[in-house]
A protein has these predicted regions:
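Bacterial N-terminal signal peptides
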Residues: 10-20
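An amphipathic alpha-helix signature
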Residues: 73-81, 97-102
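Sequence context surrounding c-type heme c attachment/ligation sites in exported
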Residues: 42-49, 65-74, 94
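Electrostatic cytochrome c docking/interface patches
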Residues: 24-47
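Flexible coil segments in periplasmic/lumen-exposed cytochrome c-class electron-transfer proteins
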Residues: 92-131
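Short, non-ligating residues that shape and space the ligands of small metal-coordination modules
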Residues: 61-62
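N-terminal secretory signal peptides that target proteins for export/translocation
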Residues: 1-9
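The canonical Cys-X-X-Cys-His
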Residues: 44, 48-58, 100, 104
Length: 131
């Protein structure tokens, strides 16, 4: 009986490993996967026009996204949050920074979707792609 349990257990470990790998792979997404909503884009445009547009045009962000290619989106979000606006870094609400990222992504050709972009919910497994 003990032998049968060992055989079953040893056969189950590789299966559990494969299932775990599939879960991890399924969680990885890119900015092409509709990771923000149209409402976030609209809200982000308002914040962008008020706080970002004077210094940064969309060409700036297009080049920025290229330099962040394959990096987790959370890194870009943290960088923008910690350094912008230049005259008062960190002064926007966390949601406003997130909405600005949604607007920047949308303006660079990435699609909106049904999922709301949230730094506390998976932004670390969403990877930036070059526009």
């Amino acid at each position: 009986m003990k032998y049968a349990v060992k055989v079953i257990a040893s056969a189950a470990y590789p299966l559990m490993f494969l299932l775990a790998c599939q879960v991890v792979v399924a969680q990885d997404r890119t900015v092409k996967d509709g990771i923000f909503t149209e409402a976030q884009v609209n809200a982000g445009e308002v914040v962008y026009d008020a706080s970002c547009k004077t210094c940064h045009n969309m060409r700036f962000y297009r080049d920025t996204l290229k330099s962040w290619n394959n990096q987790p989106l959370i890194y870009l979000w943290e960088t923008i949050m910690g350094t912008m606006p230049a005259d008062n870094p960190g002064s926007l609400l966390l949601e406003e920074y997130t909405d600005v990222i949604a607007y920047i992504l949308s303006e660079n050709g990435f699609p909106a979707g049904d999922m709301k972009l949230d730094p506390d919910n998976g932004m670390d497994v969403i990877h930036i792609l070059s526009p």
